[in-house]
Amino acid sequence: MIIPAIDLIDGQVVRLYQGDYAQQTTFNLSPLDQLKSYQQQGASLLHIVDLTGAKEPDRRQTALISELVNNLDTPIQVGGGIRTEAQLSELLEIGVSRVVIGSLAVKEPELVKSWFTKYGSDAICLALDVNINEQGEKIVAVSGWQSGGGKSLESLVEEFKSVGLKHALVTDISRDGTLKGANTELYYEIATLYPEIQWQASGGIATLDDVNAVKQSGATGIIIGKALLINQFTVEEAIACWPNA
């Protein structure tokens, strides 16, 4: 499944290199027009990251996200610095289909597990941003990648399986925004270990060959941001390569 994505800072479409706010590219595009184009080309899920909200929770772009949701028919998944239940429920109330929770799942697992129980496992996607160390361990980073988390991907997945974890988005930080290709070995490994989870691959996608490689890896979806913005290929071409299930 192809999941086109946009990152937003102060209402503008941007891309960061490896999650670094100092290495930002701004695109002169209307977020709504861009997402409408992805929708018209056949996307069955869209992904939005509120980078302003991730950095400064009191400046979350909820009004803009609400406007986008109201003007699109495609289900939308939203992430970016969700720290409280109020923020989660607000996004669900304005019509967001699924909320992406990252750092908090590492820092306060019991709290996030209670949300799975309350809102259901379809309403939440865990974002696991990993640094792979020299020993090959997949260490989940927290706080917008600015600090290490110290928990392994496997230990977190085991913990959240108890509350029915169904959707997880995994990014190899070393690939994000680089157009260097996806870490297909990573996706193959986790999809083999946990076939019951819908794995979304993210980071590094540059070509349709990359899309094909991720499709073969066992991931169920692929998030594509920068490659679409710089016209490496279109959503339509990507879907032709990997039709929506």
Swiss-Prot record:
CC annotations in GO: cytoplasm
GO molecular function: 1-(5-phosphoribosyl)-5-[(5-phosphoribosylamino)methylideneamino]imidazole-4-carboxamide isomerase activity
Alphabetical keyword list: Amino-acid biosynthesis, Cytoplasm, Histidine biosynthesis, Isomerase
Origin superkingdom: Bacteria
Organism: Shewanella pealeana (strain ATCC 700345 / ANG-SQ1)
Lineage: Bacteria, Pseudomonadati, Pseudomonadota, Gammaproteobacteria, Alteromonadales
Main location: cytoplasm
Similarity section: Belongs to the HisA/HisF family.
Protein name: 1-(5-phosphoribosyl)-5-[(5-phosphoribosylamino)methylideneamino] imidazole-4-carboxamide isomerase
Annotated catalytic residues: 7 (proton acceptor), 129 (proton donor)
Enzyme class: isomerase
